[in-house]
């Protein structure tokens, strides 16, 4: 039998406590450290280290003047090395806390736990980590942390400051406390290159918003937000709608378009409203940011959305007399007749300002058609209607504008108005989009968003972006015959022979057989839609050939005559007496005439004549291309004469707008394209009577 006296039992209990949790903070009587067997080894301010020889333990106490009989014991360890190490840490890190406010055992425990887990952290780091942010506002705390190791801007083992830590935790109150009460630096990056704003973005939007508004990293806020949005979209993927509102309000101009585009590409709602009922488009309009507004509009922003005062973005633009924004909004079909809560329409506001906005409003002129509709309708019942779309690269936007206007006047989708649709190059792509039921306004947005990708770099452009776009729109396995009505004709050129031969991609059986000795062509049932569109738009020097096919614009940039001949052969082969009653041919805009001053080539080494020869060669090359791709001159005259001979209604000239400047097929400048669409929109309004007559005929027949 082993007997323990009371002293031995007490020592055993102490050793058991030490072995279980030697760092647990608990209140102990000061009397336990009086008398023999206790040696005060070290004392720094109010932190004292004792050695208990009886139990071979080292005890660290925090002396509290307010409680003279009891005191918190910070640790009780059996290793002298541990005791000396943690005593120094505790003495340094606890002083700012106990100098500021009285501490109890339960509030000390998280502090000392943090000190042991992160010995290189400053007391400001610890205050943020433990949620004791109330200490940050006291002058005594700030004065104590002014030393190098405890500085408010000191960095931990990974380079993070206390502000980094607060932002990373999403602790809005601590962030505000540090920014308002302490001299924190906002431009310090950690060892991974992240600023406090990076950390804020990764965890909570509200913290990031506060940091931005209070000036964190304001000098590079545009770059920072862009980086944060990339992380937020790919990692967090939440609150994107709130981000779009926020970016519209605080982002500086340089990267605003990229920020908006990044959010919208990750399914952010473009028409989200803030507390005052304003959409991002309203906010950007008020700030006069036309380029960013264009980004929103090309991603589906509703130009006619009203705020709480009933104002659309066009109301705001008119009040500001901002010409660029007015053009952008009207081009994207903002209604000039929508009243706000005061009964004011954008047109009325323009008239009241009298500063120039009024002249920008499209005004309908009372023109009359060049033919008598009542007489025509009587004889054209039960006849087919043909839509022809010219080629023109990015100028397909002009076609889309005219088709949208026609669709609005008719009140029906374009595909329901025509029996036949023919197109070349960009017109061929649109023809296929029409028969497959694509929304025209979506196509307008798509053209704007895809142009930089399709026309990236130098000519000839890589085919991958264009083919990716076509596969996405039509599907990789969709066949031409999957949609049978309306019948479609897409022109291309067979360039595996001389002379070249026009080829038509169809969604019906060809009206004639061929005895071609060359490699046989794919039948419509096996022809992929995206490949037909790609073949029709394989413009030489712009894109590589599509196998043996080149752009149809080389032989039929205006496909009207070829389409009419095809329909005639089709009806003849089927012994069908159904005639072609109407042909509507839409152009991509007429370029202005320019004077040519030099055409003669010289056989001379004289520098002057050599320069003239180079200029003449350039002019001749342009003339040759104009002749090959002409769609408005002789082609229109021939088509009109053909229609007159066959008693077919032909409406062309009023639906190919005159452009003030030449627009290249690969133009990507938004300003040039918007001006082109503005001229198209204005032209359509001038020809409103003709457009209404055409729409009435198409709707009624």
Question: Whereabouts are the PLM-identified features?
Answer:
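Conserved catalytic cores and adjacent C-terminal regulatory segments
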Residues: 3-146, 152-158, 162-181, 186-192, ...
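Short, compositionally biased segments
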Residues: 202-215, 220-258, 355-363
């Amino acid at each position: 039998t082993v007997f323990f006296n009371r002293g031995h039992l007490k020592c055993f209990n102490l050793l058991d406590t030490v072995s279980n949790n030697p760092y647990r903070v608990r209140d102990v009587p000061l009397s336990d450290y009086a008398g023999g067997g206790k040696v005060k080894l070290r004392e720094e301010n109010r932190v004292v280290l004792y050695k208990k020889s009886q139990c071979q333990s080292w005890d660290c106490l925090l002396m509290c003047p307010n409680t003279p009989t009891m005191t918190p014991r910070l640790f009780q360890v059996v290793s002298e090395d541990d005791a000396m190490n943690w005593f120094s840490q505790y003495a340094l890190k606890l002083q700012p806390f106990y100098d500021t406010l009285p501490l109890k055992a339960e509030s000390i425990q998280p502090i000392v736990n943090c000190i042991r887990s992160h010995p290189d952290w400053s007391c400001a780091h610890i205050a943020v980590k433990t949620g004791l942010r109330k200490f940050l506002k006291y002058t005594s705390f700030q004065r104590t942390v002014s030393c190098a190791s405890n500085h408010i801007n000191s960095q931990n083992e990974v380079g993070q400051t206390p502000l980094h830590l607060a932002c990373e935790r999403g602790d809005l109150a601590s962030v505000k406390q540090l920014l308002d009460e302490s001299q924190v630096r906002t431009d310090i990056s950690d060892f991974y290159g992240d600023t406090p704003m990076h950390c804020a973005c990764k965890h909570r939007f509200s913290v990031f918003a506060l940091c931005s508004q209070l000036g964190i990293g304001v000098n590079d806020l545009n770059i920072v937000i862009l980086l944060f949005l990339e992380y937020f979209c790919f990692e967090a993927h939440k609150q994107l709608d709130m981000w779009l509102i926020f970016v519209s309000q605080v982002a500086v101009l340089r990267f605003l378009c990229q920020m908006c585009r990044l959010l919208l590409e990750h399914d952010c709602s473009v028409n989200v409203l803030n507390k005052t009922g304003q959409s991002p488009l309203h906010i950007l309009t008020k700030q006069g940011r036309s380029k960013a507004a264009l980004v929103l509009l090309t991603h589906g922003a509703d130009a006619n959305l009203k705020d709480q005062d009933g104002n659309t973005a066009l109301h705001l633009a008119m009040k500001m007399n901002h010409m660029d924004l007015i053009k952008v909004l009207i081009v994207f079909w903002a209604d000039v007749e929508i009243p706000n809560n005061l009964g004011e329409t954008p047109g009325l506001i323009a008239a009241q300002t009298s500063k120039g906005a009024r002249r920008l409003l499209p005004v309908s002129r009372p023109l009359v058609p060049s033919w008598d509709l009542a007489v025509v309708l009587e004889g054209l019942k039960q006849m087919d209607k043909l839509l022809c779309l010219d080629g023109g690269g990015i100028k397909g936007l002009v076609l889309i504008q005219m088709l949208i206007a026609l669709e609005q006047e008719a009140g029906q989708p374009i595909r329901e108005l025509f029996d036949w649709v023919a197109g070349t190059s960009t017109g061929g792509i649109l023809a296929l989009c029409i028969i497959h039921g694509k929304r025209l306004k979506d196509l307008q947005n798509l053209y704007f968003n895809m142009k930089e990708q399709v026309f990236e770099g130098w000519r000839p452009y890589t085919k991958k972006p264009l083919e990716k776009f076509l596969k996405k729109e039509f599907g990789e396995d969709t066949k031409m015959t999957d949609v049978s009505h309306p019948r479609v004709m897409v022109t291309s050129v067979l360039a595996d022979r001389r002379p070249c031969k026009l080829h038509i991609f169809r969604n019906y059986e060809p009206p004639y057989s061929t005895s071609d000795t060359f490699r046989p062509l794919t039948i419509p049932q096996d022809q992929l839609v995206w490949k037909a569109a790609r073949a029709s738009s394989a413009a030489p020097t712009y894109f590589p050939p599509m196998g043996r096919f080149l752009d149809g614009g080389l032989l039929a940039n205006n496909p009207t005559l070829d389409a009419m001949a095809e329909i005639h052969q089709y009806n003849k082969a089927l012994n069908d007496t159904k005639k072609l009653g109407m042909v509507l041919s839409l152009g991509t805009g007429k370029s202005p005439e320019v004077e040519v001053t030099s055409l003669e080539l010289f056989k001379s080494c004289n520098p002057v004549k050599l320069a003239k020869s180079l200029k003449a060669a350039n002019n001749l090359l342009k003339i040759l291309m104009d002749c090959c791709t002409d769609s408005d001159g002789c082609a229109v005259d021939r088509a009109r004469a053909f229609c007159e001979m066959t008693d077919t209604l032909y409406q062309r000239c009023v639906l190919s707008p005159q452009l003030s400047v030449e627009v290249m097929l690969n133009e990507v400048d938004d300003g040039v394209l918007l001006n082109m669409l503005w001229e198209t929109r204005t032209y359509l309004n001038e020809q409103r009577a003709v457009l209404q007559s055409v729409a009435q005929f198409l709707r009624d027949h």
